[in-house]
């Protein structure tokens, strides 16, 4: 690869699309019109593939649920949409990034998912819900506006949720993100990469910003070759993903202590990779 890491196209797809080896082969074969002869999957491979697909299906349900709440629920309009409007986001941008809202009810998503037949186990494994000590299911993102995180191919792999000042009492953590899972490895994902990849190639440059709203604001301003590391120091995996499309990166972090520390971290990672 241009970033200097060894490997082949299959391994690259496996790493950055979070696919198994058979899934990556099928993806590339379909993309380039190559016919492949398939062998019968082992029982273990079938189970693993089925589980990964199930986790993505549950994430798709959650994305649609959060979007529907934002558009049609009274709290979605008065709290969630009001926040996005305060940031100046247009309807087309809200739709493009599939933004949503989760009500302050602690188990509304969980109850709706169970009612529609989604398994409790998958709700927990995706990180959408967690189980309390008394075995009740609770929504991880209650009372927050929702930012879906997409893979390079556009699959919803995780979510970020921001609490709104004054809207949810007693909550001190501003952002909550999906935990690591079978399909989500934070160090290999960049927020906005699915929407930015074509512009990055066209402009031969990637702008790196800190957060979800930074990416969305720049898209709305017509600058689409932008991604975010979503509050973490840039990792080798994220550097490799950017280098897949360009060797030119401009960092637009805040000038505070945290931003300066992150920039120094980028220097170290870039030098070693």
Where are these regions (language model features)?
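Conserved small/polar residues in nucleotide/adenosyl-binding loops
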Residues: 272-273
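Acidic, proline/serine/threonine- and glycine-rich low-complexity intrinsically disordered segments
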Residues: 268-269
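A generic structural signal for short
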Residues: 68-70, 98, 185, 202-204, ...
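Conserved beta-strand edge residues that scaffold enzyme active sites
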Residues: 43, 98, 232-233, 256
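Phosphate-handling DNA/RNA-contact segment within nucleic-acid enzymes
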Residues: 47-57, 61-62, 103-249, 262-263
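Non-catalytic accessory segments of DNA primases and related replication-initiation nucleases
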Residues: 1-121, 125, 130, 144, ...
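Short beta->alpha connector loops at strand-helix junctions that form conserved
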Residues: 13, 229-231, 253-255
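Active-site-proximal loop/turn and secondary-structure-junction residues that shape catalytic pockets
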Residues: 213, 255-257
């Amino acid at each position: 690869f241009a970033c200097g890491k060894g490997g082949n196209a299959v391994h690259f797809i496996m790493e950055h699309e979070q696919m198994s080896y058979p899934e990556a082969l099928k993806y590339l074969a379909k993309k380039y019109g190559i016919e492949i002869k398939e062998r019968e999957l082992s029982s273990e491979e079938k189970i693993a593939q089925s589980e990964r697909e199930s986790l993505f299906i549950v994430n798709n349900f959650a994305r649609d649920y959060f979007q529907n709440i934002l558009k049609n629920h009274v709290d979605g309009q008065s709290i969630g949409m009001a926040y996005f409007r305060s940031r100046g986001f247009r309807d087309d941008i809200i739709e493009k990034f599939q933004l949503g809202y989760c009500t302050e009810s602690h188990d509304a998503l969980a109850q709706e998912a169970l009612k529609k037949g989604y398994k409790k186990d998958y709700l927990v494994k995706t990180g959408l819900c967690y189980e309390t000590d008394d075995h009740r299911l609770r929504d991880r993102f209650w009372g927050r506006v929702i930012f879906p995180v997409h893979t390079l191919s556009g699959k919803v792999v995780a979510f970020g949720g921001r609490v709104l000042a004054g809207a949810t009492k007693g909550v001190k953590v501003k952002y909550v993100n999906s935990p690591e899972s079978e399909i989500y490895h934070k160090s290999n994902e960049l927020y906005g990469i699915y929407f930015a990849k074509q512009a990055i190639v066209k402009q031969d440059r990637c702008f790196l910003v800190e957060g979800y709203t930074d990416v969305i604001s720049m898209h709305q301003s017509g600058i689409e070759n932008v991604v975010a590391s979503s509050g973490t120091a840039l990792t080798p995996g994220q550097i490799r993903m950017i280098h897949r499309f360009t060797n030119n990166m401009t960092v637009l972090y805040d000038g505070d202590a945290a931003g300066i520390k992150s920039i120094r971290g980028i220097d170290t990672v870039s030098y070693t990779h």
